[in-house]
Amino acid sequence: MATLSQKKLMESVRLMEREWVKMHKALVRSRCGEVKEVRYRYVEMIGRGSFGVVVKIMDDRHNFFALKRVYQDRRYHNRELGILMEVDHPNIVRLVSYFHTDKTSSGAYLNIITDFVGMNLEEYIKANRGVETEEIRSVYRQILEGLRYLHEKNICHRDMKPSNILIDTNGLVKICDLGSAKVIKSGERNITYICSRFYRAPENLLDYKEYDFKIDIWSVGCVIAEFRHPGPIFKGDTSGSTLNRILEIVRVTSDDLIGLGCLKPDLKQGVGIRKYLEAFFSDPDLLEVLEKSLAFSPCKRSTASELLRKQFFQQAHE
């Protein structure tokens, strides 16, 4: 059964496609609190999810932006807007302004206007199979720079995947869609059913609630592997089959599983993530970074700062 937010989302989609082809006026509030009137019109749908739609809009000066519209139920707090107002980094999408519309006793539409970047990494990878290692290095570094910034602010993205990473024609990378992002604290218990299944870290698949920022590192390792691997590396129809796929490839010890609250006596050793990826990547320094990103145990998985100090990312600066 569709939730109230999902029903409102479907109504919103129909409204956009029908009425937003003409210029609209709106009083918006910038990230610094300034209120002003803007004019914009709908250009095209960029994407839609369970709780929001993203459209390309154009203002009266012919500048393009992305507008994310979600139905904000009054009973729940929207963390994304607060996080976007706090962050400011070249590798994270920038909040331009926001406004509410159609306010009722049950809620309102929240409209978040951000930078428009023409392509996401899912599209980029499909169009650039066999891309040079130098380009992979640039993309990987920029993602990690953005994550290091978020993690230093105790913000975990919790939904890193190719479609949530944008790249422009100059190769500038921006992390987007902070709808699942949250400030997390050490030892805090959080929901584990987050992040798209193919990019979900083992601790989430095992329902280990005291996870940390390392889940983002795992997800990004999965994303980067797709530059050469034919599709998601840990593809499964269910959480269980995704976990089994991980166990087939990644070397796991009994202690790794016990540390995540799981006992699996019949554990069989995977081939090893590095050995598996050697069929697709030849650069030993890149393989080292991927191996550190895709360690099964979060205790053995590197942080963004640690990865950025690896030889693979130093080469471009030498």
Curated annotation (Swiss-Prot):
GO BP terms: namely: cell differentiation; cell division; signal transduction
Example GO molecular function:
ATP binding
Places the protein is found? Cytoplasm; Nucleus
What Gene3D superfamilies is this protein classified in?
A: Phosphorylase Kinase, domain 1, Transferase(Phosphotransferase) domain 1
Keywords from the UniProt entry: ATP-binding, Cell cycle, Cell division, Cytoplasm, Kinase, Mitosis, Nucleotide-binding, Nucleus, Serine/threonine-protein kinase, Transferase
Protein kinase domain: from which residue to which, for each copy? 40-313
Which EC class is this protein assigned? transferase
Source domain of life: Eukaryota
Q: Which residues are involved in binding ATP?
A: I46, G47, R48, G49, S50, F51, G52, V53, V54, K68
Give the chief site where it resides. cytoplasm
The record's EC number reads: 2.7.11.1
Could you give one GO CC term from the UniProt record?
cytoplasm
Identify the InterPro entries for this entry: GSK-3, Kinase-like_dom_sf, Prot_kinase_dom, Protein_kinase_ATP_BS, Ser/Thr_kinase_AS
- Annotated active site: D159 (proton acceptor)
Q: Which Pfam families match?
A: Pkinase
Catalytic activity annotation: L-seryl-[protein] + ATP = O-phospho-L-seryl-[protein] + ADP + H(+); L-threonyl-[protein] + ATP = O-phospho-L-threonyl-[protein] + ADP + H(+)
Where in the chain are disulfide-linked cysteines found? none
Q: Which family does the record claim for this protein? A: Belongs to the protein kinase superfamily. CMGC Ser/Thr protein kinase family. GSK-3 subfamily.
Q: What does this protein do?
A: May play a role in the initiation and completion of mitosis.
**What name does this protein carry?**
Probable serine/threonine-protein kinase MRK1 homolog
Native source species: Encephalitozoon cuniculi (strain GB-M1)
* Upper lineage: Eukaryota, Fungi, Fungi incertae sedis, Microsporidia, Unikaryonidae
Gene symbol here is MRK1
